[in-house]
Amino acid sequence: MGRPLHLVLLSASLAGLLLLGESLFIRREQANNILARVTRANSFLEEMKKGHLERECMEETCSYEEAREVFEDSDKTNEFWNKYKDGDQCETSPCQNQGKCKDGLGEYTCTCLEGFEGKNCELFTRKLCSLDNGDCDQFCHEEQNSVVCSCARGYTLADNGKACIPTGPYPCGKQTLERRKRSVAQATSSSGEAPDSITWKPYDAADLDPTENPFDLLDFNQTQPERGDNNLTRIVGGQECKDGECPWQALLINEENEGFCGGTILSEFYILTAAHCLYQAKRFKVRVGDRNTEQEEGGEAVHEVEVVIKHNRFTKETYDFDIAVLRLKTPITFRMNVAPACLPERDWAESTLMTQKTGIVSGFGRTHEKGRQSTRLKMLEVPYVDRNSCKLSSSFIITQNMFCAGYDTKQEDACQGDSGGPHVTRFKDTYFVTGIVSWGEGCARKGKYGIYTKVTAFLKWIDRSMKTRGLPKAKSHAPEVITSSPLK
């Protein structure tokens, strides 16, 4: 009887334990929630939220590495760290002229807007000559980080220190009448630049040996062998000069009243031409204001030559130093179709003027290599050619006193009869003498260019020559011929 009772009691106990087990054990998901780690409040940087970084770093000391772990970006970390470590260097707004300031450790950097430079963007580069010619109308020079403008002869500097005001009715370098339609000359860009390889070395042909005698009287009737028709330069192509478009053009005429060379009017008494032209006629005169050699238009005038000044280093074999100045017996009266071209300043000309894309050449030369002389004055826009291409194209020596201009394939060029004539370059509606038509291999031949005397190499020489009055009169009625190499 006792054993059955024990079995009943044991079964009841086990059933109770099973019921109690349901309250002692929970499911795995519930257990994981209970045992999960609770995030510590205000734990150090590796546990902080990004938005609380600056607040937390003010309460405790941060390291760069800890800040980098939060931002996960070097630029953002550096931006915060520079200010956090030593303060904001840009707080005082040190950058001028709307420059953007960037803070650094113990320093700052300014990113300047275009046209400004310097530590604080305080320098206005647009005023310097390398940009927009310093806003100068003509010559631009830099002195102590500022621009100094100046003008050619016949102009005065305006009160604003930039503009050039003519002092007379026919100033140099101005066309005496603007064409109604856009001309070739007007189409010449004054902002375009020549090829990057064009460089002009600092050289002046007037810097000669001081022991040389600057003046020697020569026999004007002496003749000299020519280089040959195919090499004498020389307008093929181009267009006619309209009224007032080429007023600086002069024409050298022989005893038969035939034009044989050109020239450039420099002033009322002086004409610039090529030295090799002096040996193509025993006697000659200078005609100005001519646009049509077969028709008188009323503005033409003929002047006798009083003194001929030829560079004494002119070499007939190479045509080096191919330059001469003529002094007239009577002054030129400036008017429609008769006005001088401007002489530039050398440094400005080589850095600014001769880096333009094109120049203008004019003359009465042949219209093609074996053709007749043109009876009408023509003009042609010719691009400057980089020196390396110039030298490679020529069968003859290209000296430092020469430069190339023209087209290697286009059938446009100067030609026989244009020699000595003007090569001018336009800058802001003023034309400056940059070359003298000298020579070339044929006319408009493929792969060949026109060769010009580089006037910028002779500006001192020209200035000295224009101050020369000549030697005592010779008995001959022919003009004096002086070989001149003015000293430095």
Curated annotation (Swiss-Prot):
Residues 183-203, 476-485 are annotated as: O-glycosylated at one site. It comes from the Eukaryota. Residues 86-122, 125-165 form the EGF-like domain. The active site is at residues 276, 322, 419. It is an enzyme of class 3 (hydrolase). Belongs to the peptidase S1 family. This is Coagulation factor X. It comes from Homo sapiens (Human). The gene is F10.
